[in-house]
Every structure is written in C-alpha cells, then in structure tokens.
Amino acid sequence: MGRLRAFLLFSGTLAVISTVHADFNCSQAPDSDMVQTCHMLQEWDSAARKAIRKRQAFNAGAPGVQGFSPSNPPRFAPSAQGCMNIACICPYMGGRMANGCILPNGQPYLMAYRKEYRMMSDNERQRWHNALIQLKRSGEYDRLSVMHRQVGSASGAHSGPGFLVWHREYMKRMEIALRMIDPGISMPYWDSVLESYLPDPRDSIMFGPQFMGMTDASGQLVSGPFAGFRTLEGRPNIIRRMATEGKMFTEQNINNLMAQNDLVSVMAFTAPQGGCPFRPYFGALEYTHASIHLWMGGDMKPPSTSANDPVFFLHHTFVDFIWEMWRQNHQNRFARENQYPPDIAACANSQHFSYAQMRPWDKINRDGLSNAYTDNLYHYAPRPTCNRNNANCGSQYLFCDTRGNPHCVAKVKPGGLCRGFEGLDSCYMGTCVAGWCRGGQQFQQPAQTTAVATVQQPQQQPQQQQPQQQRPATTPQSNCYNEDPCCNQWSRQNECRTNTVYMNRYCRKSCGLCQSNDNNRGCHDRHISCAYWRGQNFCTRRRQWMAENCQATCGWCNMNEAQLCASVARQSRRVRRNAKFWLTEPDADDFVDDFMLDYGR
C-alpha cells in the first residue's frame, strides 16, 4: 500500500498550498531565444491537454466489459531496450550469467561508460558510427526516432517535469539498441560548452567529417558518417541551419543549475497555467537545452523531426549527465528515487504527473528516477578538464585555454575561424594565423593520456564486434506477442473487427498485425526472458501477459488455453474490477492501471 499512502499524503500536501502567483507570461523570459522556447513549450502543453481530453472520450474495454475497464493494463512489451540491469539484457545478447554476463565470444558484457564525444579513441568513435549506421539500415533507428516524433508536441515528454525522466529512458533504449550490435560501445555525450568559447561554433571540429559532418549551402548534411541518412519525412539528407538563433550550453548555465537547491528548478514546470504556485525557472534544463536545438536548426529544431539527426542523442545524453550531476550533488539515494514535483494540473498537464504512464512504454514517470540506470546500466566519464600544470585535455581534438581559469575548448577545423586563439593549439592539423586555421602541424597534441585511461571497457573490447551473433536473439521474437491468453479465443469470435481499439493494442499477434516465428504447440515459453521475469515475480504481477507468453516457466502447464483464459486471466481482471476506484485528474485511467498493476493482481 506504499503507493496509495504516498498518493493520499501527497494529496494532503497539495491542499495546504495557498500562495498563487499571477498568471505567467512568456514575455518574462530573459531573451528572445527563451521567449521563443517558452511559446513552443506552451503550445505543446496545450496540445497535450487536448489529446488527454480526446483520449478520455473513448476508453477501450476488454471483450465483455462495458466502457472504462480497469482490466486494461499498460502495454507490457518486454525487450532488451526495456531492461534495467545486465541480468535482464544478457539473454537477449545470447549470453549466460556466470559472475556477470558472459557473451558467446567469452567476453564480459559491462556497464556502458559514456565519454565526451571527442574523448573517445578513434577506434571507439568509428565503432560507434558503424553501429549507428547499422541501426539505421536495419530500420531500428527510424523506429526509435518515430517514438520521439509521436511524443513531440502532445505528451509528458516535453513542457514539464516528465521531460528529464522520459529522455533518460529514451537515451537508455537507444544505447541498448546500439550495444546489441556492438556490446563494447557506449553512448557518447556532446559537451557543447566546449564550443561556446569559439568565435563561431560552426567551425568546431565537432562539425567536421570525422564527427558530425558538414553541410552544403542549402543546409543538407553531405559529409561525415551520417551523410545520406534519409529522414522520416523522406528527405535524402538531414537538414541543419546552424547559428541563425539559439546558443551553446555555457559553463554559467551549468553552474546556475548546480546552485539550485529546489527540485522544481530542475524538474521544472516549464509551461504553467494561471493558478500554478510555482514560477518557472528559466535556467531549468528544459529551457537551456532548447537553445542548442534552436542553434542547430533544421531537423533539430522541432521535436517532431529532431531525432532524425544523430546529434540529438549526443546532446540529450549530456542533458542527462547534467541532471545526474545535480542529483549526485543535492540528493541522497532515497531522495533521488522518491522526490518528484507535485502533481498540480495548473502547473503541468497530467501526463507529467508522477504516476502517469511514461508513454509509449510500460513505465510510469517516477520510474525514471530509479538509481538502477546509473547503478546497473551506465555511468559517465568526467567532463574534459585541464590546468596550468597539465595543459592537456586528453584528446587531439581539444585544446587547453590557459588564460584566466584554464578550461578545455573544441579545436577549430581546417579553414575555420580561430580569432582570439592565436598562439594556442586551437586548430586541428594546423595553426591559427591572423584569425584563421591554416594548414600545417606546428602544435602536436600527445596521444590520449591517463585523463581517459579510466575507461572501464578493457582493451579486448574491440574483439566483441559480433552483430551476427547478437541480432538474431532479438529481432525475430521480441515484438510480436499477445498480452492476454484470451486473445486467440477473442480473435475466433471476430473481436479483431468488432473491438479493434482494444484488440489492436493487446492482441496484435492473434489479429495478424505482426509476424511471430513461434510455431511451437503445447505448453512452452514464447519469450527468451521468462526465467528472468519469473524472478521479478511477474507470474503474479503480470499474470495475463505471463500466462500467454511464459506458461511453462510460471508452472501453468496443467492448463490448456481455454482454462488459462477462464481462470488465470479472468481472475486477474475480477480482482482489478473489484478494486476499481476513480480519480479526478485527466489521466486517472493511467494511475489506476499502474496502481493496480502492483497491488490488484
């Protein structure tokens, strides 16, 4: 009953809030970029509120259940990308658990170690590029990009506290997808503060052919590893229109955020309505990160197209890193997993509420607070630094500006503007002469040093590139499932045609909406991770899904399909239906589903 107590306690807390500020206006933003960002966030929030009302107009019910049905659980679609620890991921990799996960080639599967993009070795960077290209060719990159497009302007992913938790889960899923191709790589982050010191960040090595590539006069990405990436909209190349608006992250942005002690200044209400007792903090990550989207322009500007550009994932990995730095500095372990801004409809649409579903996944927003992300799956390499005693940033693509407070800066690509950095090693493969990078190698940066020797991927990791062994473990069987043992029976009763909304969501296999290679008959497991899910008590907590897909592991081989439908699944629905209760918030159905998921089955 922990969640219910927390909900009731929180409801009482909301009742004592009495100080209400005047209506918020975007003209209060500190500059034109923030004004534009503010208006966009408000537009997306308005669209989200309309979408909630539209969704409430019709709630699909299971066959035989009229109207709103508490028997409708959130979608449960287990996959490697949904895992929260290595033990869960290991079977998808074809590995075995023996003092950790051992891959088929004998190498261990380790936590990801996320480095700044320029701090990767050339080999690491090339392998990451290759994995991303393979992901694009397979169609999985586009499938993940579609997820962001679908939540771009009417969801809990933008315009409120859900922004950080949603994108944390999203970055995790992209990283796991890439590691299914090459288990030894990790998602890099782009510390755009390194560009903020340059007279023209467009001339950074970041936008050279070795990294994110270069654009032509029309803004099309025509060089670099991702040239020729067709967009979701069908354009032959990614579009960038850099530096017409917006700006890079600055060290001051990060310092300002780190100085905040109040959670709602970080997981902020960025599109409040009249009556919200919290004023927006324009130094919040959702605001400041948007300036980089504006600066990149083109596909990166609107959420509907931003994931077309791989730079999106590097940028948001850095956003996640900044958030994690704040968490480590201001919260203990308990607080990190339990502190979430209050659920106030005037401050954020209900898709941002702590117990609202993190659409489109089988999670709730507060799940994104879990320490498991950085305990089990990934951790961050420190940001590049230097000092007067060691003016080496640890990368041939960065240099140390020792004037004033020493700090690392991105090198300028050949022919780029380096004004103000004459006499420093500011040019990649060249020298800064009269404000421009000229050919030549006057400065020789040492090879990578101990600044990056803390990488926890051992030297043998390059041998782990075995996509042919990894991919078949997931691709054929991870997506096509029914979510209820009654699906086949309902399909025979023509429910796929007469109850399409429900059946298309929960009975995709029986309705022929996907293809499965599971042709086995009799009592068996359809999913590769049934043993793991049983260990998580899912035979009790997810009875319907497990009865359909993990019958053998859950010990239900003494029942045929009709008996499973009549007893296991319907018993679960009957308990949920008897415990049904109503809330007043627009996403009450999501809260009911998630509450009952843990306590009603």
Swiss-Prot record:
Binding of Cu cation B, residues: H289, H293, H316
Free-text cofactor note: Binds 2 copper ions per subunit.
Molecular function via GO: metal ion binding; monooxygenase activity
Residue stretches making up the ShKT domain: 480-514, 523-557
Paired cysteines (S-S): C480-C514, C487-C507, C496-C511, C523-C557, C530-C550, C539-C554
SMART domains: ShKT
Chain sites annotated for binding Cu cation A: H148, H158, H167
Keywords linked to the UniProt accession: Copper, Disulfide bond, Glycoprotein, Metal-binding, Monooxygenase, Oxidoreductase, Repeat, Signal
Signal peptide (UniProt feature, chain positions): 1-22
Region of interest (Disordered), ranges: 453-477
Domain of life of the source: Eukaryota
InterPro entries found in the cross-reference section: Di-copper_centre_dom_sf (IPR008922), ShKT_dom (IPR003582), Tyrosinase/Hemocyanin (IPR050316), Tyrosinase_Cu-bd (IPR002227)
Entry annotated with the keyword Metal-binding: yes
Cofactor(s) required, per the database record: Cu(2+)
Residue positions with a glycan: N25
Similarity remark: Belongs to the tyrosinase family.
Protein name, entry field: Putative tyrosinase-like protein tyr-1
Source species of the chain: Caenorhabditis elegans
